[in-house]
Amino acid sequence: MNLFTRISSRTKKANLYYVTLVALLCIASYLLGIWQNTAVNPRAAFDDSDGTPCEGFTRPNSTKDLDFDAHHNIQDPPPVTETAVSFPSCAAALSEHTPCEDAKRSLKFSRERLEYRQRHCPEREEILKCRIPAPYGYKTPFRWPASRDVAWFANVPHTELTVEKKNQNWVRYENDRFWFPGGGTMFPRGADAYIDDIGRLIDLSDGSIRTAIDTGCGVASFGAYLLSRNITTMSFAPRDTHEAQVQFALERGVPAMIGIMATIRLPYPSRAFDLAHCSRCLIPWGQNDGAYLMEVDRVLRPGGYWILSGPPINWQKRWKGWERTMDDLNAEQTQIEQVARSLCWKKVVQRDDLAIWQKPFNHIDCKKTREVLKNPEFCRHDQDPDMAWYTKMDSCLTPLPEVDDAEDLKTVAGGKVEKWPARLNAIPPRVNKGALEEITPEAFLENTKLWKQRVSYYKKLDYQLGETGRYRNLVDMNAYLGGFAAALADDPVWVMNVVPVEAKLNTLGVIYERGLIGTYQNWCEAMSTYPRTYDFIHADSVFTLYQGQCEPEEILLEMDRILRPGGGVIIRDDVDVLIKVKELTKGLEWEGRIADHEKGPHEREKIYYAVKQYWTVPAPDEDKNNTSALS
C-alpha cells in the first residue's frame, strides 16, 4: 500500500468519528430542552389560556348564539313553485274549427261584396285555450303520390260533395275512403285532359310557368295534376259550411288555403304568379269597376297568363245548360273584355270553353293609353303593391317597375326570372336590383348554402324528415328567403313559406321569384287553413320575433291546431326561449328534446324538435258514457 492510500484511509475514519459526535450532542441538546419546558409549564406548548391576550383583541363568548336573521322591513318574496301548464281538449264539435273563418262571427259583417266571408279573427279574450281534437278514427293520410287520388273518410267525414257533384266526377265515397277521379265542372274528361288542352294553347312544359294561382279551386284537382308538370299552384276557396273543399285538397297533399275575392287583397305579393286560373269560379270579374281582375293583375307576373273557363266563355253553345239568357251572358263577357283591355292585357286565344289573356311585360304602351283610357288610373306610388295583409282592394292599376329600355315591349319589368329548375337557386331579380336592404347577391347565395347545411342536420335529428314520403305538407313559419324550402326541393314535399307581417324585411316576393309559394301571416292570429293541415312545422326565431306581442302559448296552440297527429316540429331559437317553449309543449302532449346548434354546443341558438302525439275525440259510445257520468 502506498503512502497516498494510507493517508486517505485515516482521513475517512477521522471524519466518521467527528460526524457521529456532533449528532450525539444535537440529540442531547434537544432532549434537555424538552425536559426543561415541561417542568416549568406542562400545558404551555398546547394552551394559551393563561397567557396575556394580544392588544386590541377581545375573546368572544363561545356560548352566545350567532344571529343570522335579517334586520330590515322588506318582506321576503313568496317561494317560487313550478306549475305544469295543461291545455284541455276542445269539444268534439270544434274538430274543424277555423278561428278566423267562423260562421257565427261572420254574420256580424256586411254581405256586400261578400265581406262577411273574409278573415274575421276573434278578439283576444275570445281566443280558445284548448287543443282542437282530431275526429274519432282519424288516420295518417296516404303517402304522396297515392294521396292525390284517395283520402280516408274518417279524416274529413263529409259526403255532401259526393252527392252535389256526383255527375261532375269530383269525388266518390266508397267504404272507408274518398276517391278523386280528377273530374271537375269544366273538365268532364278529367283534369289531365283539361290541362293538355291548355298546353296546346300556351307552353306549360318549358319551365317558364312555375307558380300558379287557382281561384275558387274546388277540391284542387287542377293544382293536383299540374304538379306532375312541375307547376306549383296556390289553390284557394272560401270556408264551406259542410262541403270542406279546401280540406279535401289538403288531405290530398295539394297546396291550398281558405280565401275569397271580396274587399281585401289576397295575401300574396305583387308579380307572384306566372299563371292565374278560374274554372267556373263564380267570381263577378266584370263588376265592382273590375276590382277583382285588377287584383289578379297585381299578383300576376309581367307576361303572365289569365285562363278563364266556364260562364260566360262559349256562352253561344252553353247558355241553355247554364240556365241564363243569351243577353245576360253576352253582357258579362263584354264587361270582362272591357276590363281586360283597360289593364292592357292581350287576348291570346279563345277556343271552345277556354279563353286566355296575357299581361304585358311592361307598361310602356299602357302609360300611353292612359291618355285615352282614363280608367283605371295607375295606383299611387305610396300604395305599396306588396302590402297585402288586411289591405283594402283598390280599383286602380298596379304600375310595373320602370324598364331600362323604354322602347322594347318585351323587356320584363322588374327583371326576368330563370326557367325552372334553374330559377330555384338563381339570384332573384328583386335581389339583383337591390330592392331589399341588406340582401346582396352574395348574401343570398350564402343563405342558400347555409340552409342546405341546416336541413341536412335536421334530417339527422328528425329521421322522419329524411324518410321519403313520410311528410308531404310542410309550413315554414318564418321563411325569410325560402332557403328551408329550397333545400327540400328534391323531396316529395311542398312548403308553405310564411313571411310574418312583423318581419323586418318583406321577402315574400323573392320567394315567389325562386319558384316557391307562400303567404303573409300574423302568428298572433290563426292561419286561414283547417286543423291538421300540415305534417311538419318549421319555426325559425318565431317566438323571439313575437315577444311582447302575444303569449307563446297562443302561437303554440295554433301550431298544434294546424299540425296532424304524429306530425313533426322543429323550432330554432335562443336557448332561454326554447326552455320555456319546451315546458309549454308538455301541456300539448308533444314529445321532444332540445339539441345543440349545428355549429356545436357553444351557440346560444338551439334546436327543439318534437312530435305531436296521436289522440282523437272519444269513440261515440265512450263519449255518451262520459256525458252520462258528468250529468
Curated annotation (Swiss-Prot):
Membrane topology: Single-pass type II membrane protein
Keywords: Endoplasmic reticulum, Glycoprotein, Membrane, Methyltransferase, Signal-anchor, Transferase, Transmembrane, Transmembrane helix
Gene Ontology MF terms: methyltransferase activity
Glycosylation sites: N61, N230, N626
Domain of life: Eukaryota
Membrane-spanning segments: 15-35
Assigned GO CC terms: endoplasmic reticulum membrane
Cytoplasmic side: 1-14
Signal sequence coordinates: none
Lumenal face of the membrane: 36-631
EC number(s) reported in the record: 2.1.1.-
Key word Translocase present: no
Chief location of this protein within or outside the cell: endoplasmic reticulum
Cell location: Endoplasmic reticulum membrane
GO biological-process terms attached to the record: methylation
Family recorded in the similarity comment: Belongs to the methyltransferase superfamily.
PANTHER family per the UniProt record, alphabetical: METHYLTRANSFERASE PMT16-RELATED (PTHR10108:SF1096), SAM-DEPENDENT METHYLTRANSFERASE (PTHR10108)
Name the UniProt record assigns to this protein: Probable methyltransferase PMT16
Organism lineage string: Eukaryota, Viridiplantae, Streptophyta, Embryophyta, Tracheophyta
